[in-house]
């Protein structure tokens, strides 16, 4: 589903202005959610299409690596074979969460043009945010004696993985410098607030690393194609 969303957005933008200059960008970034204890390191890639010398449309896909929560949680697993001993075990786990972002919007450049020299830029955007939440169970039970995978099963109501899908709006601001015939280095900050979010199950709902307001700091390199 995620790949279809990205492909559709890319095709739409390319079809909108097929004959124009297009730029490709790659870079790294740090995502920080307001009120959550951890930051997420990631990377991004994107397209940018100029409407004129000072206004562009852009699309950016970002992936931010999973982080684990600090608090260990326990659950009970039950033996598949009713004759097994012990019949139940206590297993510890840590919950991890990542962020995937699909971001698009309009940028307005001040100073020099989009593809010339030093400029500052800013604009509004929309963002689709996908959080993958996973419970990472220890291989041994809480006593460190019994290996449980394959011989014991989780409670029927417990799902090891979940997803949160959110739609957000926000603003972006940044600076860039274009080296003639080489490319552009840039740095920008994006802030987004979630208007709508939906968790797929209780595993996703219970993550402590989801935030409705996020900030992303990006560094990267952009290459213009003519």
Task: Report residues per predicted region.
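Transmembrane beta-strand segments that form the barrel wall of outer-membrane beta-barrel proteins
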Residues: 22-43, 57-60, 192
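Residues that define the transmembrane beta-barrel architecture of outer-membrane proteins
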Residues: 37-43, 96-102, 118, 163-169, ...
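A generic hydrophobic-segment detector
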Residues: 141-197
């Amino acid at each position: 589903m995620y790949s279809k969303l990205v492909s559709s957005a890319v095709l739409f933008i390319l079809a909108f202005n097929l004959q124009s200059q297009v730029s490709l960008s790659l870079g790294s970034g740090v995502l920080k959610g307001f009120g959550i204890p951890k930051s997420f390191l990631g990377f991004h890639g994107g397209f940018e299409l100029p409407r004129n010398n000072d206004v562009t449309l852009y699309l950016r896909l970002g992936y931010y690596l999973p982080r684990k929560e600090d608090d260990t949680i326990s659950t009970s697993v039950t033996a598949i074979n009713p004759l097994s001993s012990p019949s139940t075990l206590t297993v510890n786990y840590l919950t991890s969460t990542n962020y995937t972002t699909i971001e698009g919007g309009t940028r307005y450049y001040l100073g020099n043009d989009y593809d010339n020299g030093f400029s500052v830029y800013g604009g509004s955007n929309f963002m689709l945010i996908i959080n993958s939440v996973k419970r990472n169970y220890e291989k041994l039970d809480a006593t460190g004696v019994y290996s449980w995978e394959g011989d014991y099963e989780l409670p029927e109501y417990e799902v090891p993985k979940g997803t949160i899908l959110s739609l957000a709006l926000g603003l972006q601001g940044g600076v860039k410098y274009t080296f003639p015939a080489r490319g552009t280095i840039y740095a920008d900050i994006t802030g987004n607030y979630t208007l709508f979010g939906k968790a797929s199950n209780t595993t996703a709902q219970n993550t402590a690393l989801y935030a409705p307001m996020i900030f992303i700091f990006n560094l990267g390199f952009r290459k213009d194609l003519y």
